[in-house]
Amino acid sequence: MSEQAKAPAEADFSRIRTVPVAARANKVRAADLCRPPGADRSFSAFIDSLPDILQARSFRAVVDAIVAATRSGRGVLCMMGGHVVKTGLTPVLIDLMERGVITHLASNGSAVIHDYELARWGGTSEDVEAGLADGTFGMAEETGREMNEAIRRGAVEGRGLGESLAEALDARRDLAHPELSLLLAARRLGVGFTVHAALGAEIIHQHPAADGAAIGQTSYTDFRRLVAFLPRLEGGVVLNLGSAVLM
């Protein structure tokens, strides 16, 4: 090894070929930038003020697609996870169903657990960290018992999972907030609501009243109902909200 270390190699840029800026296609133009809000503080003015770039452009495209699908009588499928419910967006979805915009709901089991608890007792979303520490996470007696009993009845009667839970809620007269339930709204409006369970991944599955066969049967019925709806999506829209895995 020589006493004098060699200098690190450096790339030679002398043969690089550049291109004129005028010949380059740009993804962002001056006209695409946002505009500060003026005197008009309406929501439509806010949307119009957004930049025509990336997610703002995508958001406008989604809105336009939903409007076009609704006006032409096409299907709008809203697939969702539990966070859509637990972060307080239920009233918006119910409003969209009432307006005839959302024509089918599909969710995992987490979403209907939160929906059931909100309608039944007016609260949901336990403290996971504290519950794991003392072993009580997912151990709510009434939630697990009532929902599993409804699913078992639904399996015997050939119902889907979503239909079974909606019927169980509808039969009760002691609900804290029935007006906040997606299950009840879908039942009232005749909007399909299919539930696609992940066996072993939802808190009611560890309850002694859980019946894996009943959960699987009713969820499979809902899968078939979802597939039967899919032809309506020709020219329609599929939304996936808050479910990065199951839906």
Question: Which role does the model predict for each range below?
Answer:
Residues 2-156, 163-247:
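Metallocofactor- and cofactor-centric catalytic cores in central/energy metabolism, strongly enriched
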